[in-house]
Amino acid sequence: MFTVSKKSLQASRNAFSPLNNSKRTIVFTAIAAFGDLLIGKDVRLADAMEKGNLHNKNGEYEHKMEQRTQERLNALRNTRPIEPNYEGHVPLWWYERMMLFGISGLKSYFHPENGENIVQLGEATALPCFLESLKRTMLLDKTGRRILQDRPNITSESLDMERLSKMDKNSVGYTYYKWLMKEGVSPDTRAPVTYIDDPVHAFIFKRYRQCHDFYHAINDLPIIIEGEIAVKAFEASNIGVPMAALGALLAPLRLKKVQKERLYSIYLPWAVKAGLNCKPLINVYWEEILDKDIDELRRELNVTPPPDLRKIRKERAKQRKQFKLKYETYEK
């Protein structure tokens, strides 16, 4: 028969006595406090981090973090040949510039549709001697000097596209606006200058880059490959841009036979002659002549647009279609 000893009974009574309950409460409280010390600290830390006020009152910590950030920036600067001279400037070592030229050149040849390749090649070939020559050209001209002084930035906002759309149909502004709409581009798509060291040179190259679409517009050349090559040749002969000269020489090599024939017989001869006869386009303050009559501007610049490339291509496509229909009819 099962029996309970007096000691077991007494232990059971003691376990449920008020004194022992009090002891258990103290023990559990101590465990909870210790757990809160270990775990609760992490919870409070996470809450403070989430609220963004973790170290708001700890000036020493903020100072240390700022110091570490500055050290990282200094370490990055120490890997560059010089300090950045303007916002967005990335100084390059000579071998990095050579690599940029080689890689961007190959990419531009095989993938001319990628604008980033063209942008990088342009800056890699923008030698200081060329930019200094362009600077002298601007300094010798009254308008060029004002452009260097004002440092204008061509954007949709600065040009006020809505105002351009309401200008006289034969004005420079409306001609530019109509060309942008026809080609589906915007002045805001021009990339900033990154790899040119001198701030003045960087501005000059940015100005050339931002004015590129005006050269298209006044000559009514589309942004298809033939139109781009023609404008590059025009730029090369007018202001001597090295990348433009390279593009005009090498880009036609990958074109179809009929495209080459058009370029070599019509557009490249026009581009060289027009560029040499035209006044330096880098000295044109486009923002100030938007109201001017486009024909009057062309006379002042001494430039005549080439034959309509879109029309020639369209007629060529029509002839091919007619020939194809005749051939199919003959086969039947």
Curated annotation (Swiss-Prot):
Any Pfam family the entry gives: Coq4
Chemical reaction(s) catalysed: a 4-hydroxy-3-methoxy-5-(all-trans-polyprenyl)benzoate + H(+) = a 2-methoxy-6-(all-trans-polyprenyl)phenol + CO2
A cellular component term, taken from the record's GO annotations: extrinsic component of mitochondrial inner membrane
Key word Metal-binding present: yes
UniProt KW tRNA-binding keyword: no
Topological category with respect to the lipid bilayer: Peripheral membrane protein
Pathway: Cofactor biosynthesis; ubiquinone biosynthesis
Record's keyword terms, sorted: Lyase, Membrane, Metal-binding, Mitochondrion, Mitochondrion inner membrane, Transit peptide, Ubiquinone biosynthesis, Zinc
EC number annotated for this UniProt entry: 4.1.1.130
Cofactor(s) needed: Zn(2+)
Subcellular location: Mitochondrion inner membrane
Summary of subunit composition and partner proteins: Component of a multi-subunit COQ enzyme complex, composed of at least COQ3, COQ4, COQ5, COQ6, COQ7 and COQ9.
Family (UniProt): Belongs to the COQ4 family.
Its job: Lyase that catalyzes the C1-decarboxylation of 4-hydroxy-3-methoxy-5-(all-trans-polyprenyl)benzoic acid into 2-methoxy-6-(all-trans-polyprenyl)phenol during ubiquinone biosynthesis.
HAMAP family (alphabetical): Coq4
Protein name (Swiss-Prot/TrEMBL): Ubiquinone biosynthesis protein COQ4, mitochondrial
Gene: COQ4
